[in-house]
Structures are given as C-alpha cells and as structure tokens.
C-alpha cells in the first residue's frame, strides 16, 4: 500500500497534503524575501488546529508514521534494494522540528524553485554536546583559528589551546591581494568598472603561467555571471566546474578530469565541496584566485545569527560573518599546500583582505608579475 493509514483514519497522503497547505500559507503570510522568519511553534500549532489534535496526538501520529516508514525501509533492505523511505524522511523531519522548538533555533520559510520550511540552529554548542560530555577531547585543524572564537562557539570549559606554525617551508606559499577591486555589493553592481576589472584579473592571471588553477567565487551567482559573459572561453584552457546542486558523482568526474589535465582551470565556490573537502597534491593545483570575500548573503537567517551572536558573545558581526568567511578562505588557500614539497600562489581579488586577521596576505601591486616571479617566469 503506497498510502498507508497511520493514525485515526489519516493516511500519509493526508499529511503530505497538509504540509503543502501549511507551506503555501506560510509563504503567503511571512515571505517577503528569499527566506523569512516564521513564529516559533507555527508548524506545530498549524498541525494541531488543522487536525484537531493535542501536541500528544501529533507526536503519536508522527511516531506511527515513523514506524510505517521504517517498515518500508526494512522491506526494501530485505529485497536488497536501497532502504530509502520518503515516509520515514518526512516523519524524521517533523519529529526533529517538534523536539527542537526552543531558544537556540529560528524557523524559516523559503520560496523559489524549491520552497521549504527550515529549523536552523544558531548555537554550535548544541551539536557539540557529545564532546562536552567527555572527560577530555582534542580538536585539531589548520583552520580552527581564531581559537578563542572556536572555544566560544562550542562552549568548551577550561580549554588548553595551542597554535603551531606550519611545518611546510613558508617560501612555498605566497598569498597576496589587490587594492583596486572588491566584491562589495554596491561596488560590484554599481557600475561595470569593478566587474570588468575582476574579469580582466582572472583572464590575465590564468594566462600568465601554464599552471593548474582554481578560481574560487564567493557565490554561485557571481560564478554563473562570469560563465554567462563567456569568461571560460577567453582563458584558452580546459575549464571544469563545481556547480550548484551538482550530483557528487558528476562533481567527482569533473575533479578527475581536472587533475588529469595539466594547466586546466577549475571554477568553484569558496566554502563549497571543492574548497573544503578535496586534496590537490603536487602540481594538481598551483594557483588559486579568490574572487572577493565570501561574506554570507544578507538574509533573515543571517540577521538572526548576527543578533544571537551579539547577544551571547557581544560580537555579532565578527562571529557570524567575518570569522566564517576567513575560515572559508583559509580552506580554499590550503588546497595549494598539502605536503612539504608543494608550492603555490593565492591571489585575493578584494582590497578588504588587508583587514582580515588570519589570512596574512601581502599587497601585490601587479599580481601577474608576482605570480610569474614566484614560478620563475620572465
């Protein structure tokens, strides 16, 4: 039965239809931009009102739905099929939503091609609870800095912190920035000069040395703008892409082809799967171009996070916006150096890099000359 009865005559289809109605009504009432806040308890109250149930009845109904979904998954597993159940997925989502209705979450409705309801946790220490219950833990990464912020985020008690210099030769990595461009919204969209200079920098830097290069954008929208304007065709190289929503298998195919193509170019997003999860040893990646600072796009979610961090830590913008951007940039730059023999250059196309602690970038009057000098070209 593809539409099993789960509680008091209600079927799965009834619950799905209910959720569609609630989502549609939430969009009509609260949505004014890409995503917007809905009141805490909104979803639970709507379910109670529309179904005529108490909170206990809602929970019992969802537990019954969960059991029905588990039965579907178990049957598929028995038949050696992928144990996937959309019934189970929906039940898990609704149960998780009900259980997290509290002070450290905000609740959002989103529109667009993929409308959704989202419960977003503002406090990282909630997810770190298993660590906090241990006698002691060790957290180690090249991108944890600033350590005092990491300690605050996770709510660690009486920590011992230590920061060590990189064991790799410092002369193997050069990081620089330019002063005449920025991806700040009013500059990027206030006229064509800044955008055209960004394009020219990317074209000139890719063309100045025949090295495998990654161009990291602060957003998919800016990357798509470069693509739509024909920049890949101006580079004279094979160009590969990390695109929004790309299946993992397709992304891995792109990465294999990129790594096998000497001097190829990769378009990716700072903070995406490539910049934070893949290694490029040896000559697989030698030049990284960071087009701007990956500050989070203004949104209801981001506003809520800034407000929460300001109230809890007294530094809302730094904690919610600046530090995450720096970590993303450090991750992207870190793709260049994975061993003591790797060498690489990172060029940040944004004057604001000068003010970012933890990036340690030097001013490049002419980044093309700096890159060519680093690799010994004349």
Predicted ranges, named:
Residues 134-135, 236-237, 285:
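Short, well-ordered alpha-helix to beta-strand connector turns
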Residues 158-163, 231-253:
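Conserved RecA-like helicase motor-core motifs
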Residues 214, 221-223, 338-378:
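Long, largely alpha-helical accessory region at the distal end of helicase-like NTP-driven motors
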Residues 1-213, 218-233:
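Conserved coupling segment at the C-terminus of the helicase ATP-binding
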Residues 152-156, 230-232, 281-285, 305-306, ...:
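Short, solvent-exposed amphipathic alpha-helical segments in soluble enzyme
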Residues 149-152, 189, 227-229, 278-280, ...:
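Short acidic, glycine/serine/threonine-rich loops at helix termini
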Residues 179-193, 242-352:
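Conserved RecA-like P-loop NTPase helicase motor core
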């Amino acid at each position: 039965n593809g539409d099993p009865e789960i509680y008091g005559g209600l079927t799965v289809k009834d619950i799905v239809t209910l959720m569609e109605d609630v989502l549609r009504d939430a969009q009509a009432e609260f949505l004014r931009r890409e995503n917007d806040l809905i009141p805490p308890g909104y979803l639970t109250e709507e379910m109670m009102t529309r179904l005529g149930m108490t909170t206990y009845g809602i929970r019992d109904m969802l537990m019954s739905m969960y059991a029905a979904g588990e039965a579907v998954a178990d049957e598929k597993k028995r038949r050696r099929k992928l144990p996937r159940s959309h019934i189970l997925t929906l039940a898990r989502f609704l149960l998780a939503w009900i259980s997290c209705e509290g002070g450290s979450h905000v609740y959002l409705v989103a529109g667009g091609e993929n409308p959704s309801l989202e419960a977003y946790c503002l406090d990282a220490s909630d997810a770190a609870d298993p660590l906090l219950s241990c006698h002691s833990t060790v957290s180690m990464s090249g991108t944890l800095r600033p350590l005092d912020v990491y300690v605050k985020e996770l709510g660690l008690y009486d920590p011992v912190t230590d920061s060590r210099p990189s064991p790799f030769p410092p002369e193997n990595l050069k990081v620089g920035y330019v002063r005449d461009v920025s991806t700040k919204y009013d500059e990027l969209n206030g006229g064509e000069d800044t955008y055209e200079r960004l394009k020219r920098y990317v074209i000139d830097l890719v063309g100045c040395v025949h090295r495998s290069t990654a161009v990291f954008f602060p957003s998919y929208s800016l990357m798509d703008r470069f693509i739509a304007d024909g920049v890949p065709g101006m580079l004279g190289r094979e160009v590969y892409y990390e695109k929004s929503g790309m299946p993992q298998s397709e992304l891995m195919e792109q990465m294999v082809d990129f790594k096998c193509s000497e001097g190829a170019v990769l378009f990716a997003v700072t903070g995406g799967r490539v910049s934070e999860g893949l290694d490029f040893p040896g000559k697989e990646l030698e030049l990284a171009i960071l087009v701007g600072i990956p500050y989070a796009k203004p949104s209801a979610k981001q506003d809520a996070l800034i407000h929460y961090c300001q109230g809890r830590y007294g530094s809302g913008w730094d904690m919610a916006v600046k530090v995450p951007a720096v970590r993303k940039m450090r991750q992207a730059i870190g793709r260049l150096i994975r061993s003591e023999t790797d060498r690489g250059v990172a060029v940040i196309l944004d004057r604001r890099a000068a003010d970012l602690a933890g990036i340690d970038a030097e001013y490049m009057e002419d980044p093309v000359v700096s890159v060519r000098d680093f690799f010994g070209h004349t």
